[in-house]
């Protein structure tokens, strides 16, 4: 069955939202502060109107195709924030994604990770709107003050940046779908026209012949180079031509480590800030020109194949080099990689043009597992888009012995049958294998490295997102009817019980059940207890 038209989704969503306003307005006699999060009671009513999940999926489909500025989406977001969508960072009740740089980003994260009923909560401490200060090498023309006092000029610049950051990834995402003439496109000509109108409003001060440029204050040299590129473009340019332009940009990736917490999946806007504001190339894919090569090698190829030809002037082909590369990573990271047309085009290019073939291997000796038609390729690309190392694709040979599937892909699709554990009768024991390693390894690493270890936290996050069921899908309950303050404390208890030959599984949290609710301090005690027991066990075996 084909996807419903954009107008049908809009009509359906308006019907769904009809009772929303009065329901939330009756919550309390005193008027809540505009822009503040809903109370738990208000959220129960709010989510009740988005239940069952197909209703939430409908709103997500609309958000994905129209963006956060669609009037119906704006109305929905206003309901969730007492009439005013906040401008700046927000916090959530998700244990491993506790804050986001905008409410739009938070909403998109809920949709892309299928955690439809995650709640916005009050932040325990102020969070800066842009996290560029966390990058030591960042050389931004605008300094972000550590205090709350800013000059009117600085405030205006920050507001402009925030506006462009919110709109830019949405435009890129639509552009890549438009470029590839996706059969998965949900909007058609009517949506494209509406989206271009939104872009025109945001860039009303720009010359009409320069609509593809963004209000980010790029240097004059880059603007001139961009104009020269546009002059050379012809109507028959293909996806390969665009990728070749990315290769000619000669992007080089630095080797200094970056904070792992600022990953593309949880912080796309901070990532775009790095690409837009830093003169040095972003740390994304080492030696990207080796993957993409130059346009001269591809000009004569596949001209006969209409599937790879774009009939639209502009779009992604007119973006600057860095953005053209970023859109590929953004597209596969913020959507389900195995279903995106950009991933299919990228895979085709590497297999046929660059001669890598069907098998996917990297320079770490790993052979990415083809659990589905695009799984192996997406596993590699998601790792490359997030990688802090010089990760490159290689021709597969006998040296690539380690079977591997990226946890980033597992978190996206939740369909890796050989990795994901079984979920029966509302219970979930955990992932059978993560990163090629079984639960015993991860329990040991949790005991020795703690919850904050990068690899441990990635394992915990993937497992947490692998099971969302019950009346409170973001809460963590087990088969002993204990409710945990976070997933790490539950996993510590599960590892402890496993060591004692007792099986404890995660169980859906139900409204009509009674649970022993643990405090955060009790949760920390469980983590410490497992660490101590593991240390004792290790000493007794090897001491």
Curated annotation (Swiss-Prot):
InterPro entries named among the record's database cross-references: Kazal_dom_sf (IPR036058), Proacrosin-bd (IPR009865)
Residue stretches in coiled coil: none
Disulfide bonds: none
Keyword Protein transport: no
Maturation propeptide residues: 26-276
Modifications made to the protein after synthesis: The N-terminus is blocked. Phosphorylated on Tyr residues in capacitated sperm.
UniProt keyword rRNA processing, yes or no: no
Pfam families tied to this protein: PBP_sp32 (PF07222)
Signal peptide: 1-25
Region (Pro-ACR binding): 26-106, 319-427
Region (Disordered): 187-239
UniProt keyword annotations, A-Z: Cytoplasmic vesicle, Phosphoprotein, Secreted, Signal
One GO term of the biological process aspect: fertilization
Main location class: secreted
Compartments where found: Secreted; Cytoplasmic vesicle, Secretory vesicle, Acrosome
Biased composition (Basic and acidic residues): 193-216
Cellular component aspect of the GO annotation: acrosomal membrane; acrosomal vesicle; extracellular region; nucleus
UniProt note on tissues of expression: Specifically expressed in testis.
Biased composition (Acidic residues): 217-232
PANTHER family reported in the protein's UniProt record: ACROSIN-BINDING PROTEIN (PTHR21362:SF1)
Listed name of the protein: Acrosin-binding protein
Organism whose genome encodes this protein: Cavia porcellus (Guinea pig)
Gene name as annotated: ACRBP
């Amino acid at each position: 069955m084909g996807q419903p038209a954009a107008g049908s989704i809009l009509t359906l969503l308006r019907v769904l939202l009809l009772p929303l306003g009065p329901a939330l307005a009756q919550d309390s006699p005193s008027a809540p502060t505009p822009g503040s999060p809903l109370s738990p009671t208000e959220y129960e009513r709010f989510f009740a109107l988005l239940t069952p999940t197909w209703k939430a999926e409908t709103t997500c489909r609309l958000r994905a195709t129209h963006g956060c500025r669609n009037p119906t989406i704006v109305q929905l977001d206003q309901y969730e924030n007492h009439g005013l969508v906040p401008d700046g960072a927000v916090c959530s009740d998700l244990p491993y994604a506790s804050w986001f740089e905008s409410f739009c980003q938070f909403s998109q994260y809920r949709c892309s990770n299928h955690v439809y009923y995650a709640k916005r909560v009050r932040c325990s401490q102020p969070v800066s709107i842009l996290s560029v200060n966390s990058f030591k090498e960042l050389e931004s023309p605008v300094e972000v003050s550590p205090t709350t006092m800013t000059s009117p000029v600085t405030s205006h610049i920050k507001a402009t940046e925030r506006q462009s950051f919110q709109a830019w990834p949405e435009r890129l995402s639509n552009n890549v779908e438009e470029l590839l003439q996706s059969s998965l496109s949900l909007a058609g000509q009517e949506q494209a026209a509406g989206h271009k109108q939104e872009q025109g409003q945001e860039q009303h001060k720009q010359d009409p012949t320069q609509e593809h440029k963004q209000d980010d204050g790029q240097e004059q040299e880059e603007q001139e180079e961009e104009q020269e590129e546009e002059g050379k473009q012809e109507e028959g340019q293909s996806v390969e031509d665009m990728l070749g332009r990315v290769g000619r940009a000669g992007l080089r990736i630095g080797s200094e480590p970056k904070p792992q917490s600022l990953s593309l999946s949880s912080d796309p806007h901070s990532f775009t800030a790095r690409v837009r504001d830093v003169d040095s190339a972003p740390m994304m894919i080492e030696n990207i020109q080796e993957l993409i090569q130059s346009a001269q090698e591809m000009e004569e190829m596949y001209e006969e194949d209409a599937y790879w030809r774009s009939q639209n002037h502009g779009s992604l082909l007119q973006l600057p080099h860095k953005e053209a590369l970023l859109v590929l990573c953004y597209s596969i990271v913020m959507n389900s990689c195995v279903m995106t047309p950009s991933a299919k085009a990228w895979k085709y290019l590497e297999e046929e043009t660059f001669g890598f073939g069907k098998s996917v291997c990297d320079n770490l000796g790993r052979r990415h597992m083809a659990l589905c038609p695009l799984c192996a390729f997406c596993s590699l690309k998601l790792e490359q888009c997030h990688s802090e190392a010089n990760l490159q694709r290689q021709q597969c040979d006998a040296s690539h012995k380690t079977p591997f599937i990226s946890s980033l892909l597992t978190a996206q699709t939740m369909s890796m049958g050989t990795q994901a554990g079984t979920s029966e009768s509302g219970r979930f024991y955990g992932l059978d294998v993560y990163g090629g390693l079984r639960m015993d390894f991860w329990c040991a690493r949790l005991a020795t490295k703690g919850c904050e270890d990068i690899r441990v936290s990635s394992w915990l996050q993937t497992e947490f997102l692998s099971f969302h069921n019950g009346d409170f899908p973001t809460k963590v309950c087990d088969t002993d009817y204990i409710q945990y303050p976070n997933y790490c404390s539950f996993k510590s208890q599960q590892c402890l019980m496993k060591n004692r030959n007792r099986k404890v599984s995660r169980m859906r949290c139900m409204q009509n059940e009674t649970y022993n609710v643990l405090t955060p301090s009790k949760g920390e005690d469980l983590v410490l207890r497992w660490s101590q027991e593991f240390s004792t066990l290790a000493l007794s075996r090897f001491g």
